[in-house]
Each structure stands twice: as structure tokens, then as C-alpha cells.
């Protein structure tokens, strides 16, 4: 990937009011994107957002820029990121734009693009947009200006799409489900999907006010969900993040079920139904218990770099159809084009309904290994601690002691002088001691 000025691996993101998430920048971005995308023929762009208060300001700025370039905007209102990808495909729009900062706090926001087929924009198009940003903004003739309109049935369309990924012969009528929508974009979607499939639904995190997205609710903080599942004696809980591309679950005992366990359940069910093609893709952070459990089932497993973008790239490279991060991004290419929390959750619910098993029992075939993470700061000018012989020696000792039943992963932070030490194995006390031994070696450099 070339050096970008604005686009990161997941679009453009930052604190609202600070560059680049300012009204003037976003207007210019809309104009530049419009100039580039207009070359491709269609003049429609879908714009969706999550529930952040800044979404109103940013969608107006985007629309003004697009209109100046001669493109029309179709607004969805608050809508999950995967819904925008789906609507972009079905409306055959030239692109879809999501205004969201996913699981971040309300004061952050971001802009992410989807291409006409519901996948990430090609690098070449992002680079062309960046090149256009360097030019002086101009306006097409008045007769050529773009317009804005609203897709009034956007939510209904996406609800039907989600329901269609759940087998017709199954029902959720025997399940009591607590759903936590993080006060985010799934608040008017997920409870309706589950109710229409027959579930008894208790909804929390469904009262967005513009500033409470992801605040002590949702996939990044499941404590409220765990408490409610136990209080209601529910069969399970499902949590989404602010833009609905992540899902984390909670079993009837209040235990957290993460993206690794969700992928295990879906992959095993695919194997049982004769629908699994190839293997499954995780990341460097995926639990070793997942790798061993899939191996026992004869399902190939590969690790990608951390980030759903890299998971998708590895899936495409291998020709596989399922991938996930332990954070809850689950990509099911047989169902959709991007990570979709609602669709992934429905596949787990289908496995529960088909096998008449609890979520707790479906997870029992996979033993999660203790994973200990230690962050170690180092002096930026002191060179790379990971290249130091003493660190290499201690790491080699730990790897030898763990053998094939554990892992060591050392990663440098991309944003600060920090080494992330991760040690994984069967014995938590031993793994903790090993992690701190490596951390001490890094500190001593």
C-alpha cells in the first residue's frame, strides 16, 4: 500500500473538530470522491451513519460536496455499516459512504467507503480521491448539480435481508434473548429481526441520544448485558458495537462468548451441514484453543494480521468463506460481503435451534487457552527491543517451554513506543509468569 495522506486501513477516522474530521475537510472529501466516482457512470451515492450527534453535520457536508461534483446522495439515516454495504449493492449505487467510528466513543467519527459490489473501495480509487483533494474545489453547472433524497424503507429492506440468512424451517420461538445495541446503529434493526423470527426479546442499549453510543454498553463492554441475562434468566445475550459490524455473545450462565468461539460454532455447523468450503481465517490474536478445536474437526485454519481488512484479504487469497477476529468481526462471504454482527449472530442462533443446544453447550467443544497480555513502554530512541539478543533469548526459552501447546506473540504498537507481549498456554499461572519474564527482558534493554 502506498503512503496515504488521509485514508487508513479502515477509512478516515479521528476526533470531531480536529483535522481531518472537520466540516470543511469532509465537504472537500465529498467533492473529491464525487469527481472520481462520476467517471464511473452512476451518479448515486448511498450515505449511512451511526447514532453520533456529529453524523448530522458530517452527512450535510458530504452531501454538499457530492452535489457540487454532480452526484446525488441517498440518505439511509442511522444504519449499520453492513446495511450500507448491502444497500449499495441493491441500489446499484456507485458507492456507499458510512459515517461512523465503529466502537470508538461518541466524540470520534470517521468516513468509510464501499464500492458498487459492497466491498471496500479499491486502493487505486482511494488514491485518486486523495489526488483530487489537492485540487481547488469547483462546482458543476447548475443544471448538473446533484440532489439529496431519503431511502424511506432502508431499515425494512435490511431487516428482510438479515431474516433471509436464517433458515426458513427454523424458529427462535423457544428463546429468550437480551440484545444490547450499544445505543448505536442496530437499535431499530436487531430487536425487530429477532422478534420477527419468533424470539422473546429484551432490548438494552437501544436509546441513542447522540452522545451515549458505546458508553458502558455494546460489544466492547458486556457487563450490563451479562447482568441482564442473569437477572432475566434469559437463554443468551447478543451485543453489537456502535456500527453493527461486531458481535459478542453471552451464554445463560453469563459467560462471554467472543469472535473466536462464534467462528468455531459457525464453522462446525457448516461442516455438519456439508456447507463449509475450505477452512477458516483468524488473526495473530485468535485463541490457540480455536486452532486446536478446528484441527480436531479437520478444518484448516490460517492466521492473518490483526484487522478485518487483513482477514478478508487472507480469505480471498485462500478462497475460503469464513473468517473472524476475537473482537467480534465475523465475515461470512456466503451470506454477505463484509463483517455483519446481526448476520453472524443469526447463524449461531440457527445452530442452537437446529441442534436444540444452549450457547454454553455449543461452545463446550472448544477449550479457550489463557491469554496474558502485557504492554511494555520503551525509550523511542533506544532502537528496536525485539532485535535485542537478551529479548530473543528469553523468548526462545519460553517458546521451548510451551512447545506445541502455547504461543508467544510480540508486537510493536503502530502509534506509540510500546511492545505488546502476548503469551498463551494451558496453565494460566505459568503463562502469566512467562509473559512478565519477557516483559522484564524488554524493560531491561
UniProtKB/Swiss-Prot annotation:
Q: Note the HAMAP family from the entry.
A: GlmM_B
Provide the catalytic activity annotation. alpha-D-glucosamine 1-phosphate = D-glucosamine 6-phosphate
Q: Name one GO cellular component term.
A: cytosol
Q: Describe PTMs of this protein.
A: Activated by phosphorylation.
Its GO biological process annotations read: carbohydrate metabolic process; peptidoglycan biosynthetic process; UDP-N-acetylglucosamine biosynthetic process
Q: Which GO terms describe its molecular function?
A: magnesium ion binding; phosphoglucosamine mutase activity; phosphomannomutase activity
The gene behind this protein is glmM
* The species this protein was found in: Escherichia coli O1:K1 / APEC
Protein name as annotated? Phosphoglucosamine mutase
